[in-house]
Amino acid sequence: MEGEAVVIDNGSGMCKAGFAGDNTPRAMFPSIVGHPRHTEAMMEIGHKHSYVGDEAQSKRGILALKYPIEQGIVNNWDDMEQIWHHTFYNEMRVAPEEHPVLLTEAPLNPKANREKMTQIMFESFSAPAMYVAIQAVLSLRASGRTTGIVLDSGDGASHAVPIYEGCALPHAILRIDAAGRDLTHYLRLMLAERGYAFNTTAELEIVRDIKEKLAYVALDFEQEMQTASSLNYELPDGRVVTIGNERFRCSEVLFQSCFLGMESAGIPETTYNSIMKCDVDIRKDLFGNLVLSGGTTMVPGIADRVQKELTAFEPTMKIKIIAPPGRQYSAWIGGSILASLSTFEQMCISKKEYNECGPSIVHRKCF
């Protein structure tokens, strides 16, 4: 093994990167790639072919912005490669051929995607070794557990992922159709009804900020509708927006997807259904170790509400919800822990193994 391992957690909304053994990621930037809208004119005045992360955000007026990861799954590999290139060379300032790499993946990531990630790391970046791990499994590891159920809700996807002795149980992983981006869009819709229009990509970022600063989960939705108070939020241009029950109505989509016009179970019911798909002997361990992870679980009040609704499903079971601080990057922290273990080198796919077996080696070594 060459230098210390680089850990990259690629989320739909944010990319987190840093060195194994660190407590927090060194780099966090939006998972976006911007291409100039008018290519020829832009090139003449010295602009680049593409921009990544914060730089793409700052130039969003002249760029077409794209998220290469949607609902946790990569959908544009050229843009994804740009994000990794930016991560290594601009954010981390390392030569990728000198460092083993740990990448994270969404639960139920298609096999072809895992192979493509592996291929790009070895062929485009000449990594000496690499490993792929499921985000929720790393989040559980970050909480100091090997068995439990992780309720992971980020910007693009939410999942209930039961894990036994460090291995996810794929047959029982369930996806929830609401995540952070849905909350932001729903809040924008409600603000429009109040007469505040947020239409551009730039304005949507303001809505996201309002959500992150003011949103919360109501313990009792109907009661909260009667008693909710209003708050003011100052926009960058100095105007003031008044926000009332929108503060908790936006996060209610995690519990009542009908608000988004969908007919699917909310977070507590999906978590319960996931546990019930597992062997009866381990259910007690899952109910007793429910770990929240991902940025969307940072919304105040979520743990109490999940506890209340799960208890209604299973009144006799002891239910324990763990909401670690810093859980918006707990997958990265779990990756940092895993990649600093003395056994990590044996776990990795080496360049030699890749050259002998090709990308499909990832299914044998990373599970």
Swiss-Prot record:
One of its GO terms (molecular function) is ATP binding. Its main location: cytoplasm. One of its GO terms (cellular component) is cytoplasm. It comes from Physarum polycephalum (Slime mold). PROSITE patterns: ACTINS_1, ACTINS_ACT_LIKE. It is found in: Cytoplasm, Cytoskeleton. This is Actin, spherule isoform. InterPro entries: Actin, Actin/actin-like_CS, Actin_CS, ATPase_NBD, Heat_shock_70_CS. It catalyses: ATP + H2O = ADP + phosphate + H(+). The gene is ARDD. Keywords: ATP-binding, Cytoplasm, Cytoskeleton, Hydrolase, Nucleotide-binding. The lineage of its organism: Eukaryota, Amoebozoa, Evosea, Eumycetozoa, Myxogastria. It is an enzyme of class 3 (hydrolase).
